[in-house]
Amino acid sequence: MEGFEKVTVYGVSFDVASKQPIVLLKVEGRNRFLPIWIGHPEAAAILMKLQNAELPRPMTHDLLAAAIEQLSASVERVLVTELRDNTFYAVLQLDASGQEIRLDSRPSDAIALAVRTDAPIFASTELLNANGIEFEQEVEDVEDIVKEFREFLDEVSPQDF
């Protein structure tokens, strides 16, 4: 997709300073990451699916995925589009009998749905250029990425943007 790069969910971590979970998206084929601060329920929803946890009852995102399927639609892709006023934005792109439907979404909800439906996730190249973190060598630990990004945030000022 022009203007977008394919990303995968690299992991979910916890930012000790802000006491918030972070989902880390990794650009496919590169050592570039996009950290997105998310809520605790969405972090749990993403982690449970990534860890193949079996639950006795469906969670909200499981219910939404089942409803989309029962309506003969499918999640085609998730687009993480921008960061505006400290808020990330995403678009959930559905296919309903050949009709494209685009829904405004929080990235955390869209990602939680994507991991349940195996839908590809894409991030805007512009967003990645402005907010991504690139490592020269392969990173093994999610915590290293969070630490590196926290250090970047501590050193940056609004004038840098």
Regions found by a protein language model. Name each.
Residues 1-161:
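Divalent-cation
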